[in-house]
Structure formats: C-alpha cells, structure tokens
Amino acid sequence: EFRRVLFRSAKYNVVGVVTVADKPSGRGLKVNESAVKKFAVENNIPVLQPVKLKDPEFLKQLADFKADLFVVVAFRMLPEEVWAMPKLGTFNLHAALLPQYRGAAPINWAVINGEKMSGVTTFMIDKDIDTGGIMLRQECRISETDTAGDLHDKLMPIGADLVVQTVEGIIEKNIETRVQRSFIQGSEVLKSAPKLTRELCHIDWNDSTRSIYNLIRGLSPYPAAFTELVPAAGGAPVQLKIYAGAKVEGDEFRSMLVRCGVGDGISSGPSHGDQNGVDDNLAVNAKEGHTGSNIKPGQILSDGKSFFAITTADGAISLTDLQLAGKKRMEVKPFLAGFRNPSEWKTTLGTSKVEIDKTRK
C-alpha cells in the first residue's frame, strides 16, 4: 500500500529502496524477498539490502543515489550516518499518535491497553527514538473487537496517504514541524510501546476479564497470546495459542458455571499455584465479580463440545480461535473434537499482568 501510493506521484522520483536482506523461511528454507523489494524490482528501482547500516560500502551506495529526502516505514533504527545524509532530512511514519506509544510495537500496545483511538504520525528522525518534530497526524478509531492485525490493516491506507502528503509538503515547503511536547494535554500520561516479549504473551489468568481479552486482541495474529496446559495427573506442559476469545461476565458467567456443574459451596482458598507453577483447579479462590460462586482464576470450563473457557479474576474468556502446539489453528468446535476431557487439564501461572504493569509505572 505504501509503495504504490508513494511511487505513483509525478512530483518526484523514487531513486532507490532500502529493505531487509532476503531470508530463508518455511520447511524448505526457501529464500523469500520482501514485498517492497519485489515491487521495486518490477518497477526497475535499485534495491539495497544491507546487513549492517554502518557498512562503508552500503553508505557509499546510499550516497550515490543523491536523494533529497529519505522516507522510513516499518524499518529498524537508523544511525546518524544514514538519517543525516539527505539535504531535506529523513522522516518516519509511526503507527500511533505521537507522542503517545513511542517504541517498537505501537499497534499492539494500543489494543492491549484498550484504546478507542489510534492513528499514524509522520515525524523527522533525530538522535533519539520517536522524539523528532511532528509534521502530520491522522486519527483512526479502534473497535471493541479489533485485533492488532485489524488495526494494522486500517492504518495502512491512512499511513500511505499521510506519507505522500508529508513528502509533498516537504518538497513544496508548506509543512511545519511541531515539538512533540506541544501535543501533550495537561496532566496527560505518556504510554510506551516496548518490544513484545514471551513473558507478555503468557497469559496471567489472575488478571481481569477485560484486560485478558484486550491482551489476546493486541497479540493477534502475531505473536499470539498463549497459556500452558498440564495434565492434572502430571506431565509436561503443552502450549495453547489463543487468537480470539469472548468475554464471559455476570449472568452469562454464572450460567456457564451451572452448565459445567460448578455451583456454590466449593471450598475457597488462596490463589496460589503448586511448587511447579501450576494452578490447582480444585482449589478455588473467592474473587470479587465471581458472584454466586467461589472460583479460582485459570480453571478450565467446557462442555467438551461447543465451548472451552478459562476463568479470570472476575469472569472467564471463552476461546474461539486457538492452536495447540504441533497442531493446526482452528475454531473451538473442531478443536474440542480432537481434545478429549478438557476438564482433566490445568493451566500454568502466566506473567502477562506483571509485564503490562511495568509499562504503567
């Protein structure tokens, strides 16, 4: 989307493209080219694929383009030798409304934090990460069901148009930059968008239903939130990736407990795992929000046919799109057809809540 919109203008010439090196992937380790490279080759545009951005040979080839302006979209951090090279400077497209969500994963974190609004920003690159002067911003709404993948697809055409507007504004000298702090309103707290980690992806079922629901959306389709399942009788944990789920709260949650034969009077106890970090689904913790039943977060609820849910601090998440390690990704009904006796499995303690809390300090 970006390349097609940018290359179609007659007001300037695209003299070269810098993209990632070709990498082998898949079972056959077939070498795959980036979409940017394929498009550039098809349109007879020179392509550079450096391994190191400070490589003298690469810097010479880049300088030989004699470009007036560099445009950066979804690339790595540039050394000053690169971004300071063109006379009109270098600008970047960031998938958030800067100064909010500076960092490597702004789309994911906007969804993880349950934002209702995101957007794209063009800004001049300087010595620090995502701090340069802002030129243009464009908002985009996030729906209650949007995943990170959905938001990415919404932002793509908006970002492409914003890049073209920015290029034309710079060339025609009718665009201004504003310092990022001028966009901060009152006591507004800046939120960060750090790199996604395995610890973030491992769901902590002691968190709230809404928080876990947003985490699943924000990590879908990649890298995907996950939990680990362990046979109640003992054995090695098996990873279960979760691409989509639905919140189960209030009366709907109480109805699910009845369907699963879980009623009042279950013994209550503190929310601890055993020494191996496995939630004991037979121990049940009284949690506010679990009205009418004392239930421990991380317990599996399923009828074995149509639904597979895992309890949270105040409800449950009904899993709808999931993938067991070594198996295909599938919807819940075909999953349950091959996953026998779900109630005989336990979940392990996750780490997502701690990782989310780190970004809010």
Segment roles from a protein language model:
Residues 10, 43, 85-86:
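Short, structured coil segments at secondary-structure junctions
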Residues 186-270, 274-361:
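Internal anion-binding site segments
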Residues 3, 20, 67-199:
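Donor/substrate-binding cores of folate-linked one-carbon enzymes
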Residues 20-68:
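N-terminal glycine-/serine-/threonine-rich beta1-alpha1-beta2 phosphate-ribose binding loop
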Residues 3-28:
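N-terminal Rossmann-like dinucleotide-binding module
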